[in-house]
Every structure is written in structure tokens, then in C-alpha cells.
Amino acid sequence: MKSIYVALTCRNCGYQTHKQSETLILSDFEPYLKKQLIDETYFSAICPCCKNKIDFLHPCLFVEKKYRYILFIKAKHDQKATDHLLYQEKAYCKRYVDNTTKIKETMKILEDGYDDRAIAIMKLKLLLHLRKQEKHPVCITYFDSEKEQSSIWFKVKTEEGEEMMAVHMQIYDNILNILPKDDH
């Protein structure tokens, strides 16, 4: 809803270009931009000279009214204590996302009705468990949940490949019970 032009420099050939982008995205009005965030194409461009992909990040506020959450998308060094004043709707869950690869996962967690803080702790526990078994995950991401089966699924990438791992819902509930209440 608020357009800007982002200056881009190709890391491959040094070509300088720009891309129009938004600093405020309301998913109700711009569902195509939400899709670009999920597809990880919103914060990227193609160099007109060498055709390589250019990744970038600029401060952006994403508001999802249906699921009642707000993502403050910005690099860690750009985050300020007053950012929460930008959108003061108390009923919304507010989260910082400082990496474009985390946007999709954070959206999925919040839209599935989970607390992303508890999921992050579950991922850390899973990482430690796998390391004890001499497995060395490169990446662990939230995948999905089966509430009727009482399990939360994670995609675990290792140097050998990829596998799905389920964690019992009781672990999530136990973690959630010890976390401080999220006052949004």
C-alpha cells in the first residue's frame, strides 16, 4: 500500500537497478503479495544484465487480519524498541522476522494457531536430540500438524537428505505452559 523503489546492486556483475516494493502489505487487499512472501519471491529480483537472482530486504509491515498477526520484516540492525507503536492493535500477535527464509515458516506456524516461540524451542530440543544421535541437521523447519494424531511435524534437512519427524503435541503444551504469556 505504500510503494518505494529499492536500489539493488547485482553481486555477480555489479549492475545497479531498482525494484518497486511496498512497506505496508495488507493481505486482505493484496493477496498476491502474500503469495510472493510465501513463495520467497517478494524480496528478490532478476538482474537485467546477467539474469542472476538478487536477494534484498527492506523494512516492511505485513498485516494478516484473518489470522490476527503482524510481521515486522526488517534486518536485526534496523529494529527499534518503538516499532511496536507502528500498529497498536492489541488483539494481534506481533512478530519480528529478520530473514526472508523465515517469513513462510512464521506465517504457517501462526496461521496453524501455534505460538512460534514454543515451536522455536521444540526445534532446538529436536536439534539437540539429533546431535546426541550423531546426526547433524543443517536445517529444521516447521512443516505441519495433525491435531487428531497429537503430533507436530518438522522437516529435517541433513547433508544426507531430508526426512520428516513428528514430535508429540504434549511437548508443545508443556513448553507453552512455562512460557510467559504473550501479550501481543
Please name every model-derived segment:
Residues 1-76:
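N-terminal cysteine/histidine-rich coordination modules
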Residues 64-184:
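Long, contiguous alpha-helical scaffold regions
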